[in-house]
């Protein structure tokens, strides 16, 4: 049990190019934690966390261009990656084998996100549509139309009720998944929304933008609860802690920041990366944070619980 924030491990030269996306998974055989990284070197790598360090478990080859987004299914056994080659690939985390490839259409897959029941996979598109694919079939089942600009970021609410999308013009849309209806349009940012994340209780939506601000919205009434500043440049990623109390952000200012949700304050700043930090994620129990950056490194941090 840790009482303070500290860096546990640095994996240098983790990839041959910038690392833009990261996730946590689990090995169902021995219960060990896995870190999944996606890079502009076209590769997805699966790392095993053991003895306070990362060990490369498998390298997943198949994408023809850089990997821009990875997500692990809530069920924990499947991983999805999307690439600049306009393909989404589904992988078996255990074996490292590709389950299927989905052609998302010309330049049409950016970020990918699994639904809470692991049955669907959502991806944003250039024409302002969120496309929903069946995980079992690999077929497009339906689309949610924002009638807006290129969608950079998407997130499901953990209760399965909502899907939020963030566009390149700073507009955020929240859809009701059951009806497919657009519920709310939020115009709090004037620049691209790089990332958004719902709180585990699905009550709050946190958004990250190139305008340097993080905003917290109360989902039900679509009201702005807070605007947080602290990063010196684009905010590239945000992720919630599993216990609802904190979230983490990363930025092109090379920092990773941990925020207290109720106090609306930054409680710790990590300055260990040498370049812009594209991805951050809490592990399942909130004891660790992983970050990835343009410096080709993966960092794992210890969090007080």
Swiss-Prot record:
InterPro entries xref list: Beta-prop_EML-like_2nd, G-protein_beta_WD-40_rep, SKI8, WD40/YVTN_repeat-like_dom_sf, WD40_repeat_CS, WD40_repeat_dom_sf, WD40_rpt
Pfam families xref list: Beta-prop_EML_2, WD40
SMART domains reported in the protein's UniProt record: WD40
GO cellular component: Cdc73/Paf1 complex; cytoplasm; euchromatin; nucleus; Ski complex
Chain segments annotated as transmembrane: none
Any one biological process term the GO annotation gives: transcription elongation by RNA polymerase II
Presence of keyword Cell membrane: no
UniProt keyword list: Cytoplasm, Nucleus, Repeat, WD repeat
Ranges occupied by WD repeats: 14-57, 62-101, 104-143, 146-187, 188-227, 230-269, 272-305
Top-level taxonomic group: Eukaryota
Chief localisation class: nucleus
Localization, UniProt: Nucleus; Cytoplasm
Gene3D superfamilies from the UniProt entry: YVTN repeat-like/Quinoprotein amine dehydrogenase
Family per similarity comment: Belongs to the SKI8 family.
PANTHER family from the UniProt entry: SUPERKILLER COMPLEX PROTEIN 8, WD REPEAT-CONTAINING PROTEIN 61
Subunit structure: Component of the PAF1 complex. Component of the SKI complex.
Function (record text): Component of the PAF1 complex (PAF1C) which has multiple functions during transcription by RNA polymerase II and is implicated in regulation of development and maintenance of embryonic stem cell pluripotency. PAF1C associates with RNA polymerase II through interaction with POLR2A CTD non-phosphorylated and 'Ser-2'- and 'Ser-5'-phosphorylated forms and is involved in transcriptional elongation, acting both independently and synergistically with TCEA1 and in cooperation with the DSIF complex and HTATSF1.
Full protein name: Superkiller complex protein 8
Name of the gene encoding the protein in the UniProt record: skic8
């Amino acid at each position: 049990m840790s009482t303070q924030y500290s860096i546990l491990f640095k994996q240098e030269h983790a990839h041959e190019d910038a690392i833009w996306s990261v996730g946590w998974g689990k090995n169902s055989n021995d219960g060990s934690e896995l870190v999944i990284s996606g890079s502009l070197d076209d590769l997805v790598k699966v790392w095993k966390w053991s003895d306070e360090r990362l060990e490369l478990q498998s390298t997943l080859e198949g994408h023809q261009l850089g990997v821009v987004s990875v997500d692990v299914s809530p069920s924990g056994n499947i991983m999805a990656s999307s690439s600049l080659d306009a393909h989404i690939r589904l992988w078996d985390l255990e074996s490292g084998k590709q389950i299927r490839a989905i052609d998302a259409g010309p330049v049409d897959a950016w970020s990918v996100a699994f639904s809470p029941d692991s049955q669907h996979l959502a991806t944003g598109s250039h024409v302002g549509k969120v496309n929903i694919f069946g995980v079992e079939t690999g077929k497009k089942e339906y689309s949610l139309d924002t009638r807006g600009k290129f969608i950079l970021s998407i997130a499901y609410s953990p209760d399965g009720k909502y899907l939020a999308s963030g566009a390149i013009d700073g507009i955020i849309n929240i859809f009701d998944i059951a009806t497919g209806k657009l519920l709310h349009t939020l115009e709090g940012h004037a620049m691209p929304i790089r990332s958004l994340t719902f709180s585990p209780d699905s009550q709050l939506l946190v958004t990250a933008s190139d305008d340097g601000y993080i905003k917290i919205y109360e989902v039900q009434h679509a009201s702005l609860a807070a605007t947080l500043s602290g990063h010196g440049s684009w905010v590239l990623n945000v992720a919630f802690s599993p216990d609802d109390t904190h979230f983490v952000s990363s930025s092109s200012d090379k920092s990773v920041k941990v925020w207290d949700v109720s106090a609306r304050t930054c409680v710790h700043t990590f300055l260990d990366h040498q370049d812009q930090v594209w991805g951050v994620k809490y592990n399942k129990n909130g004891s660790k944070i992983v970050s990835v950056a343009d410096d080709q490194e993966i960092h794992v941090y210890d969090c007080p619980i």
